[in-house]
A protein has these predicted regions:
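Short, conserved beta-strand element in jelly-roll/cupin
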Residues: 97-100, 114-133
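Non-heme Fe(II)/2-oxoglutarate
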Residues: 1-87
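Conserved hydrophobic/aromatic beta-strand scaffold that supports enzyme active sites
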Residues: 7-9, 95-97, 125, 155-157
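Histidine-centered catalytic micro-motifs
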Residues: 105-113
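Catalytic core of Fe(II)/2-oxoglutarate
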Residues: 120, 131-170
């Protein structure tokens, strides 16, 4: 594993037209909605996530995402050095829907697995939004850092153990 980067990004990975097509496909074909107990909780056992999350299997969405899997493996190999498994067709992809009317947000958390047989090394995010206000993506690795590069269309990879949050959408 490389310690050089906390995150890696590619701006304009998807165009506005592609983002709209992908979002609409997920909204119309999602297989489930994330359960409340699957998200990070605070010390009072309340959800830190105030957003709706649609789930879709990788096998159902991968053709719409072009070379995403190859890109992720390549960027990982050159910037992080994790040994990643190929994407599984039954693995769930998440679409977090942040609503400005509800001031949607996701408080400080890190990504992890509750499994005894696999773990999570790398988190991959694609910003499928159109322009918006608020909803800043931040990481904390010794100090808080707003990832200004995470704009609509950006592909972002980061080490899953790094604390991160999404500020309220306004």
């Amino acid at each position: 594993m490389s310690w050089q980067y906390d995150y890696w990004y590619v701006e304009n990975y998807y165009s506005a037209k592609e983002r709209k097509k992908i979002s609409e496909y997920i909204e119309n074909n999602h297989t489930d909605i994330e359960k409340p107990d699957a998200v990070a909780m605070d010390k009072n056992n309340a959800s830190k996530k105030k957003a709706n999350t649609l789930l879709i299997e990788w096998g159902k969405i991968k053709n719409m995402l072009g070379n995403l899997e190859s890109s992720v493996h390549s960027y990982n190999q050159h910037n992080f050095g994790y040994l990643l498994s190929p994407f599984n067709n039954l693995s769930k992809c998440l679409l977090n829907v942040y609503d400005s009317k509800k001031k949607s947000e996701y408080g400080w958390h890190y990504d992890a697995s509750r499994s005894d047989i696999y773990d999570v090394k790398l988190t991959v995010l694609v910003n499928l939004s159109d322009k918006y206000t608020g909803g800043k993506f931040c990481i904390f690795n010794g100090e808080e850092h707003v990832v200004e590069e995470f704009k609509p269309g950006t592909l972002l990879l980061f080490k899953s153990y790094i604390n991160h949050k999404v500020t309220p959408r306004s």
